[in-house]
Every structure is written in C-alpha cells, then in structure tokens.
C-alpha cells in the first residue's frame, strides 16, 4: 500500500481507530518480527547494499539509491540495481530497458534506475541478484526489500522522512509500520533522515542506542529549471506528493493548481485530457515528478504525446555529510569481504 493510498489517521496522533485495530496490528507485528528473525537469506558473491524503510510509502529511497550508485561508479565499482518492480508483469528476473519497457510491465522506479545503471527486476530477489552477478556487477544496490527474507544484505541503510517520521508509530493495519521499530532496527546498519523536521527523532535515538551511524540528506533540483515566477499546474502520483509541491515552491514556482494521484498511478487518456484542459484554461505550465514523467513516456501513445507538454522536475539526493556515501559503500564492501573470508 502506498502512502497516498493509506488511511490519513496513520500519519496523525494515535486515536480510537488505531487502538481499535491494535489486536490485528499486534498479530501482524508478531508475524513480521518472526519472519525477520527466522529468515534464511541467500548469500551471493557480491556486496549487497539495501536501501529500505520502516514504513509503507515513499521516503526518498530511490534518490538515495541513485546518489550512492553514482558515487560507487566514480570509485570504479560495477553497480547493478535490484528491484521487485511495482506492479510488474515479469515473473522471472528481467533486465529493464528504459527505452523499450513500459511502466505497466516493470514499474516506474526501475525505469528511473535503469537510466543510471544495469537494473534487474525480480519477485525473487535472490534470483535477481544472481542475474546481476552473472552480468559482472560487484555491488548490488537493492531499492527496497529491507523486510525481504530471501537475500542476505551486507549493509542495510534505512531512509526516514524527517517530516513524517513513523506516523502514529503503530504497525499495519493500525499504522504505517511494517514491523515493530525495535525489531527492525536489529537488522539495520545505518539510518539516513531525509529533509527537515524532528519526526524522525525516535528513529535517530533508537539507532544511536544500537550504535548505528545516522546521516542526513535532502532533495534538491539537479539543475536550473526556469520555474521561478511560473504559474504551474503541479501533478504527482507518488507516495508523498507534499514533498514534491514543497520543492516546486522552493524553486519559486507559483502553484495555482495541485492534482495528486495514488502512488505508481498509471495515467489514463481521461486523466491527461483533464489535466490538459485545466492547464489550458488558466494558461498554466504542467509540471510533474521524474517518476510520473517516465510513467507517461513509457506508456501508450496518448500519454507519450501528453508528456511532450509536461516539464519534469529533476531532483537528486545530497548528503549533508560529504563523507557519508564513501562510508556507507566502504562498510558494505568490508562486510562482504569478511563474509567471503568465512566461506
């Protein structure tokens, strides 16, 4: 379930709805914890760096994954991305083609990742990792999959939105947590808080008590975008569209209309026709996220035609600590080397 599809009370202080679901939440949390503890994860002959989160929905994992991949490639490593592929139709490991694959077939995030490095989607993450090793990758960056029980992770980096944090702190279905915090932190090697805010403080304290490093990062536009003073219709189908709108405003854009869709939304002809009409009526510039843009581009012809009239806001994740990417990648490689020596 995506954050934008989640019940609003998940992101508010706990109320009667959360407490009414507590029995189900407790059972789910117990099962999730047991699965994490009992997992028999396959170990492969390459370092595996997982970029995960503690809750459902978007926290900024993909920009962090791309930032670390770029740094690793500058170090001379051969990087491959591994993703489950949201809503994808492939049952076996599949190498993503950013030109030929559709968002419906492979998912939007894999299309973005494939523009940076070799990307494999696989419902069986261990099988997908083996495919990347066969292709010569010596560092596998797994976008999501922290709770997966199939693949051994040499380093698990948890991404937390500093503004939303853990929501009401309850485990699904009473809240957005995928498992209890203390249980998940047992398997984390580091934490990065995204953006400004203090909602992630509980995670920071938990990481500090466990002796895990904590980093901070933020999203910024990759280049000058010409949006200052422009009247725009901003639309997005991502986990947390408010972050996108806030970034647009920080660029100086005048957001006249906002249109939010569910996360990973596959736009229809009706959607794009309505957006075009609304923008034309007020003479507004259509602006969306990179994820939404690739979903439009890698779709049917009406959506591709519409994409030609849309500007994508290109962003990147930047660590506040200049040495953070190196520290994370080095830790993943060191853990892998130690693992290989024990074979």
From Swiss-Prot:
Enzyme Commission numbers on file:
2.7.1.130
> MF terms per GO, please?
ATP binding; tetraacyldisaccharide 4'-kinase activity
Top-level EC class: transferase
Residues that bind ATP, according to the entry?
55-62
Q: In which pathway does it act?
A: Glycolipid biosynthesis; lipid IV(A) biosynthesis; lipid IV(A) from (3R)-3-hydroxytetradecanoyl-[acyl-carrier-protein] and UDP-N-acetyl-alpha-D-glucosamine: step 6/6
**Keywords, ordered alphabetically:** ATP-binding, Kinase, Lipid A biosynthesis, Lipid biosynthesis, Lipid metabolism, Nucleotide-binding, Transferase
- InterPro entries hit by this protein: LpxK, P-loop_NTPase
What are its GO biological-process terms?
A: lipid A biosynthetic process; lipopolysaccharide core region biosynthetic process
GO CC terms on record?
Answer: plasma membrane
One Pfam family named in its UniProt record: LpxK
The catalysed reaction is: a lipid A disaccharide + ATP = a lipid IVA + ADP + H(+)
Give a yes or no for keyword Phosphoprotein in this entry.
no
What family does the entry list? Belongs to the LpxK family.
- What function is annotated for this protein? Transfers the gamma-phosphate of ATP to the 4'-position of a tetraacyldisaccharide 1-phosphate intermediate (termed DS-1-P) to form tetraacyldisaccharide 1,4'-bis-phosphate (lipid IVA).
Record protein name field: Tetraacyldisaccharide 4'-kinase
Supply the source organism for this entry: Chelativorans sp. (strain BNC1)
- Taxonomic path: Bacteria, Pseudomonadati, Pseudomonadota, Alphaproteobacteria, Hyphomicrobiales
- State which gene encodes it: lpxK
């Amino acid at each position: 379930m995506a954050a934008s599809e989640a019940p609003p009370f998940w992101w508010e202080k706990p109320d009667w709805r959360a407490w009414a679901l507590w029995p189900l939440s407790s059972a789910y949390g117990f099962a999730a914890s047991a699965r994490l503890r009992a997992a028999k994860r396959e170990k492969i002959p390459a370092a595996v760096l997982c970029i995960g989160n503690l809750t459902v929905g978007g926290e900024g994992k993909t920009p962090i994954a791309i930032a670390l991949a770029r740094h690793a490639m500058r170090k001379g490593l051969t990087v491959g991305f591994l993703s489950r592929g949201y809503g994808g139709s492939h049952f076996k490991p599949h190498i993503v083609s950013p030109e030929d694959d559709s968002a419906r077939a492979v998912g939007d995030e894999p299309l973005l990742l494939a523009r940076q490095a070799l990307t494999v989607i696989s419902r069986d993450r261990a099988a997908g990792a083996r495919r990347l090793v066969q292709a010569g990758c010596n560092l596998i960056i797994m976008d999501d999959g922290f709770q997966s029980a199939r693949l051994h992770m040499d380093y698990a980096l948890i991404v937390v939105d500093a503004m939303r944090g853990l929501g009401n702190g309850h485990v699904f279905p009473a809240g957005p947590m995928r498992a209890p915090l203390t249980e998940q932190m047992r398997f984390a090697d580091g934490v990065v808080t995204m953006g400004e805010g203090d909602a992630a403080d509980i995670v920071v304290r938990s990481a500090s008590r466990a002796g895990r490093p904590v980093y901070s990062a933020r999203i910024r536009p990759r280049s000058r975008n010409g949006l200052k003073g422009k009247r725009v219709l901003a639309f997005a189908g991502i986990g947390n569209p408010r972050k996108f709108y806030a970034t647009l405003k920080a660029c100086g854009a005048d957001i006249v209309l906002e249109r939010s869709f569910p996360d990973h939304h596959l736009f229809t002809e009706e959607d794009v026709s309505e957006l075009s009409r609304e923008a034309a009526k007020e003479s507004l510039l259509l602006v969306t996220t990179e994820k939404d843009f690739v979903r439009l581009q890698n779709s049917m012809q009406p959506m591709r035609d519409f994409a030609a009239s849309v500007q994508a806001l290109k962003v990147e994740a930047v660590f506040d600590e200049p040495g953070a990417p190196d520290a994370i990648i080095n830790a993943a490689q060191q853990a892998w080397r130690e693992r290989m020596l024990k074979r």
